[in-house]
UniProtKB/Swiss-Prot annotation:
Part of the gene cluster that mediates the biosynthesis of elsinochromes, pigments consisting of at least four interconvertible tautomers (A, B, C and D) that have a core phenolic quinone to which various side chains are attached and which play an important role in fungal pathogenesis. The non-reducing polyketide synthase PKS1 was proposed to iteratively catalyze decarboxylation between acetyl-CoA and malonyl-CoA subunits for polyketide chain elongation. It comes from Elsinoe fawcettii (Citrus scab fungus). The lineage of its organism: Eukaryota, Fungi, Dikarya, Ascomycota, Pezizomycotina. It is a multi-pass membrane protein. It is found in: Membrane. Keywords: Glycoprotein, Membrane, Transmembrane, Transmembrane helix. The chain crosses the membrane at residues 96-116, 160-180, 183-203, 220-240. Glycans are attached at residue 31. Induction: Expression is positively regulated by the cluster-specific transcription factor TSF1. Expression is up-regulated during nitrogen starvation. Its main location: membrane. InterPro entries: Elsinochrome_Biosynth-Asso (IPR053018). This is Elsinochromes biosynthesis cluster protein HP1. It comes from the Eukaryota. One of its GO terms (cellular component) is membrane.
């Protein structure tokens, strides 16, 4: 069964694409302004939508094998927003090797910094009274501190470069990575940024004495910070539709983490999200992604902006 839907985002005619649903007892929600009279026929039900009218429809679908819905969008972002998409493996971002490389290097850096403080390898001026009282830290001379400085310098640069690299890879392939892998890359970049900042505890005097290295790192830190801020821009779309009073009419368990991250950037760039997206950002209830599903919840607005709180 094929149903053609027409949507008006104020842009040229789209190239139709196909979304296939393979779920039973699926409920599909349509909430759009239609550009022409459209007859929506799914299973045994038929609904006529008037041209130019803003309509909200909940269509119960009983599927034996599959239902194909041809939607006017390219790529299939509208179809994904309606039917969702399961996450597909992406070892280049979330593979064991990538994760191990980030975590092991982070643990090594943290262990090295803590050891330097505990064993007196840090500059004496960096050890405060609270460090001595609570962590039994000891200050050392410059000669002893220099033994760790070269190793920490290399590890610090590694964290800065890997954080920038993984975000650059995510930005370069937005249509090829899912929401799950996009947020995974952003979190790894945040980890790299935090670990890099921890190394500066032992490098303060060195960077103060070597200005050219200082400005190189300031430039890298600024670039990573800007990239991290930009990476958060589309996350408000996690609250892309306001909750209706009749929350039982919405899809409760729709796979969502597999939707391409580029879909959210595309809506953000066009600045034509559903009219109620602004209301959704400030309402007590909204759509959100959690554990690979789309659901309804009345949690804090912070979850709409910070990915770490939405899974």
């Amino acid at each position: 069964m094929t149903t053609t839907l027409y949507r008006d985002y104020g842009r040229p005619e789209y190239t139709p694409s196909v979304q296939t649903f393979r779920r039973t007892n699926l409920q599909v929600t349509y909430n759009e302004t239609w550009t022409q009279p459209t007859t929506l026929a799914v299973s045994t039900s038929t609904t006529t939508i008037t041209a130019g009218a803003f309509e909200t429809r909940w269509v119960d679908v009983s599927i034996v094998e599959s239902v194909n819905i041809v939607i006017g969008a390219a790529p299939n972002c509208d179809g994904y927003f309606i039917g969702g998409k399961n996450v597909e493996p992406n070892p280049d971002i979330s593979g064991i090797g990538v994760l191990a490389a980030f975590l092991v290097s982070a643990w090594v850096v943290w262990a090295t910094v803590l050891y330097a403080f505990a064993r007196g390898q840090a500059d004496a001026e960096q050890v405060k009274a609270s460090d001595v009282r609570f962590f039994r830290a000891r200050g050392g001379d410059r000669q002893r501190a220099g033994k760790f400085r070269r190793a920490i310098l290399v590890l610090s640069d590694q964290q800065l470069v890997t954080g920038i690299a993984i975000l650059a890879a995510a930005f370069a392939n937005l249509d090829g990575i899912s929401v799950y892998h996009y947020t995974f890359a952003v979190r790894l970049a945040w980890l790299s940024s935090s670990v890099h900042l921890s190394t500066l505890l032992l490098l303060r005097r060195y960077l103060r004495e070597h200005r050219r290295y200082l400005w190189f790192r300031v430039g890298g830190m600024t670039l990573l910070f800007v990239m991290l801020m930009i990476s958060l821009l589309p996350t408000y779309m996690y609250a892309f539709q306001e909750i209706n009073e009749d929350t039982t009419s919405y899809i409760n368990l729709r796979p969502a983490n597999g939707i391409p991250a580029g879909c959210f950037w595309r809506v953000l760039a066009s600045w034509r999200p559903p009219i109620d997206v602004v209301k959704a950002s400030y309402s007590p209830g909204y759509w959100y992604f959690r554990s690979g599903k789309v659901g309804v919840d009345g949690q804090s607005i912070i979850s709409a902006f910070i990915p770490a709180f939405t899974f």
